């Protein structure tokens, strides 16, 4: 399935049904009076946040959405049927903007609903205009037009941990080894072309991790593929920065990613960050110790290590402990995108 995280959609809600102008016509009743019913309301277009969908791919094939019109009122004071609403599931984390780019709403919780286009109200039948001074009104009102607009949908993935790093740092391998993610893995840059989600289970606690495609220098300007996905990091509670320990200059690798985060948004650099030296099975213990010390001196942070053989439970437990401890982090809705 393609990963679509932006879409421009035309919405047209249903028109309200017209009111009816009619009079009661029955045998032996000379002046039956007005009996025109109201028109039905037009159908609305509603978005609902759901864990059953992970991308906006629906809108790739459905860029124009039109709801049903309301039915006109009938004689004998019968109301017209209302048009059926259209309810569309979108991923949790979907933001809705107007055509000018102003944020309208942010669907960031399960089953959160938003009426994106309101259906028109049904017209009023002539029976409703009957008064003591006007016993036989002939006028009625037409149904109102439904809302009609262009909107822009943008998806920002919600996860506990955002995995960042240069291309080929081993982010996908790490995600696959500790979660049920089926991400593609290969020994060349930009293997991951779209964000991948995985769920790890530690001591009956769920941890959602997002593998953000590799960033390179200039990503915030559009170089590589990272600029498209930097926005997804904004929704991650904490960051796990994975660095390939076989690189000659690991400090430069670290600084490169931090610079791109800073140039995109200062808020990203203020997120809690954990650093993981990866592929440690490719170096001897002395080399690893030297690189850990250099990185720790530069970042003033504890450096964790990982390899193919080493269990990931330790670092995952630390991540969960931090999320549970820090009350300032709002833990997002947890779901398993591979078990729906």
UniProtKB/Swiss-Prot annotation:
Binding-site residues for Mg(2+), renumbered to this chain: 172, 192
Gene Ontology MF terms in the entry: GTP binding; GTPase activity; magnesium ion binding
Domain Obg: residue ranges: 1-158
The protein's name: GTPase Obg
EC number: 3.6.5.-
Localization (cell): Cytoplasm
InterPro entries: G_OBG, GTP-bd, GTP-bd_Obg/CgtA, GTP1_OBG_dom, GTP1_OBG_dom_sf, OBG_GTPase, P-loop_NTPase
Domain of life: Bacteria
Keywords: Cytoplasm, GTP-binding, Hydrolase, Magnesium, Metal-binding, Nucleotide-binding
Protein's organism: Ehrlichia ruminantium (strain Welgevonden)
Predominant location category: cytoplasm
Residue ranges constituting the OBG-type G domain according to the UniProt record: 159-325
NCBIfam families: Obg_CgtA (TIGR02729), PRK12297.1 (NF008955), PRK12299.1 (NF008956)
